[in-house]
């Protein structure tokens, strides 16, 4: 698990990384999301629905929703189609696998071939309630002999903006619903992860009502052994918009309260929130982590990308994509950014900003991070083994509340750290040296 220490200072922005000038690539109107598969890049654009009726009307000057495919080696578009069945929902939360696009359409799901853009099924699943609206899809896949197979869909849906929604697990094998559970108001994003026991858990971000401070992350474990799934509700803040999971840490983007709220998924604990520094309607949109370079990137409607270190809290800087950014992706040593709207305005933009990551730094940081440390616990003694010898290594032990309970420095390949006298529970051990930076989750128990 990566260090939580960056959360204390990442958004106190006084830029130390010089701003980069992006390369702008033309695309459709209002690009929302980017998805890379092998040597192709998929960009989903929502056009311009001038009267907001969901119907494309070219005679009124409207622009259609479109799906572009780019060559990842040349950054040139090779395919593009108009989405004939109308505009996308915002937030845009389709299900994407290595071969398929599962697109929510009110109470139905459309299925497309990802390489040919062919519509394979116009109604894979149809909810019985016509008022239901599918708001988010996540694809559960398995690997067999090196081949990825889509086995299930986790989908969220709602019937109103003020009542609780539902999460549903749908089998692509049996074409049956395996689980349905009530969650919070306006569920809109789903992710899966493996807990410390190796069990799959589903995390559902519920937006809540704007200004209501009732956004929540619902975590569901279907392997409880009781026949009834366990569900944990983690209260967040105002208007959750996006989240990522890195190891056992979820980082949730709160658009209404202008915060990033971290959640320790191992202990189901909400950690202290951090102000992003935006205000009004210019709040944070999405978050992405470069785990190799230990950097966090946050898109904001203040027309910038905010960057911080994921390891030690160092503020790195801001980049300006020349638009209001939405979705982001790392592709071939570049950060791709969707400019959904014009900078400082809400007129749909039609560009993607490419920021080339500094290659020398990029390679150097990855080489350093390949030096791993082995950490094990035995009878209350934590044994730390590194590949370094004769160099000082700083260590910090943090509990689930973010409190540092032990810290120090050792020199050599092995160090023994006593947990005796500390309460049983989960701790994060962070190591830092000139050549090593890593964090590990450990459990101290009887």
List each model region and its residues.
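A short beta-strand motif characteristic of beta-propeller blades
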Residues: 20-26, 76-84, 118-129, 176-182, ...
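Repeated scaffold domains used in trafficking and secretory/extracellular systems
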Residues: 29-35, 85-96, 130-143, 185-194, ...
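Short coil/turn segments that connect the beta-strands within blades of beta-propeller domains
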Residues: 38-39, 98-99, 148-150, 198-200, ...
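Short, conserved, GDST-rich strand-edge loop motifs in beta-rich repeat architectures
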Residues: 45-64, 149, 155-162, 205-214, ...
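Short, surface-exposed loop/turn motifs with a glycine/proline- and acidic-biased composition
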Residues: 198, 403-435
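Blade-level signature of beta-propeller repeat domains, shared across WD40, Kelch, NHL, RCC1
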Residues: 323-360
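Residue-level detector of functionally pivotal "anchor" positions at catalytic/ligand-binding pockets or at interdomain
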Residues: 355-381
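C-terminal tail/sorting-segment detector
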Residues: 382-383, 424-446
